[in-house]
Structures are given as C-alpha cells and as structure tokens.
Amino acid sequence: LSSFPEFGPGGPPLLVPSDPGSQRGITALDRLPIVDFHKIGILYAAPGQRSEQEILSNTHGSKAYIEFISSLGHLVRLKGSRELDIYAGGLDQENDIDGRWTYLWDDDIAQIVFHVATLMPTSPETDPQATLKKRHIGNDFVKVVFNDSGAEFAFDTLPGDFNFVNIIIQPHTPAGNPWSGPGMTNNAEFFKVSMQCRTGMPEVGPLGAFKMVTGSSLPAFVRQLSLHSNIFAQIYLASVGFEARQGTQKLEYSSNWRKRLQQIKLLKSRILQAQGTALVNSAAAPLDLDAAEASRMFTAWL
C-alpha cells in the first residue's frame, strides 16, 4: 500500500466506528468495483452484406475473423460467471439467453467484455430483426466491425443514440508478390484499420486516415484502440453530451477508482466530524522522504 499523494505526516490512522452510519459507508465502499469496466461490440460483415439485419444475423465469420476474436481475450462461459466476479456488460449470466460464451480481457485496472454478435443466439423465425443482439451491441459506445463485405461500411448501419465510434477492419493482404521490407515476411497477412466517429466528435487515437497492421498484431492493437475510444466516448458524453428526443443529455464520467476515493474521503470526513476534529486547509509541507517512508509503516501506530 502507498500513502501517495499524502507524503507528509498525517497523524495516526483513523479507527472506523462501529456505528450504523460508518458501517453503511464501508458497505458502500465494498460494493464499488476495484477495476473499470468496458463493453465493446464486435460485428462481422460477410461478402455482399450491407444492412443491419444481415450483419446481426451472422452466426460465424471467416477464418481471419475467428483468429482475430480468439486473440482479443479469453473465452469465458457466461452461465455461472457472476460467481467469479466477471463483468458481462449486461449479457445474461444465468440462462444462456445471450449465448453460452463470450470473450473477456482484463488486467489489474480494467476489464473488457466483448459483445460478439456471432456468439449470440440467432432466431430468424422469432427474432428476424435480431433485436436481442442489438439491445446489447446498439448500446455499446464503440463497435469493431470486421468488414469482409467488399464495400465501405456506413457509419449509421447500426443507428442509435450511443453510436459514437466504429473501428473498421478490412483484410488487405497484397495480391501477388507481397510487400518486402524490414519485418515483413512472405506469409504475413495485413489488415487495414480505420475509424469512424460520430459527427462533432474530435478524432481520437493514433490512426489518422488508417493504419496497415499485421494479423499477429491486429487483436492487441484493436483492443487497445477500442479501450481508449470507449474511455474517450464517456468523457465526451460528460463534457458535451448527445442530442436525444429529450434534448441534450449528459452522462457523468467517473472511474471506479475515483468513486472509491470519493467514498473513502466521505467516510473520513464523517469520522473526523464525529470526533469533533475540524478540517483545516493548510499549505503543503515540503517533501520529507524520511517522514514519507515512516508514514507507510502503519504498524508503528499499533
């Protein structure tokens, strides 16, 4: 544990009282996740497909598409995943309503669930418009489209209030004699990666017009790009908002880490008030490394 950013002497740790108010504060803190959650839509457009219904109705994709999604993260069984503290982004975790499997990626500070359209149930008889798929993917701020259609993918193919960023992947391996150059092998596959943004949104990420990416680097590159785009879309919503039927709507953006910090500060403030201690704003003391190190030794106060 670190005392950053409070390097200076801050006094002994505060004992949390056992009164109902303080215990409710601890309970509220326990309910806040320790990582940030993200959900990204994944679509496959087969040759000749252009409409929303055609694309959402796909149950499989090309070999390159399968290799791509299988390297985005690890495959997880949805049923029973709630007990493993897995974030499913709204996918059913009990009755396989939204499919049996999905892909998940996580590290120490974030967790991404991918809403993969080809892994969700397709029912042409009972759900010809694939509304069960769209209720999830249509609410994702960022969608990744593996475009094998042979045509340009229109931004509003899946229209919706939360359609902010589309990341388009197109197979682009040169025909005939492959490119030659440093790092390029004769059996390398290449993909053109481009981005579409909602009107009014500034450009985000390193793409520019587009980037050519090898197949081996594609999953990690697109995953990182979609993560940054999803964070940016949330900040954009908080600062600018979006036009809806009710007028301009704004959604506050706050990371789970920030929410936990706010809850800790609130709990600390209540404890100090209960002890009759006034909070006094004072100028920051010069950094004392010895004192900073000593402040990390919590056992010294026991």
Predicted segments with their positions:
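Long, non-globular regulatory segments flanking folded domains
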Residues: 1-302
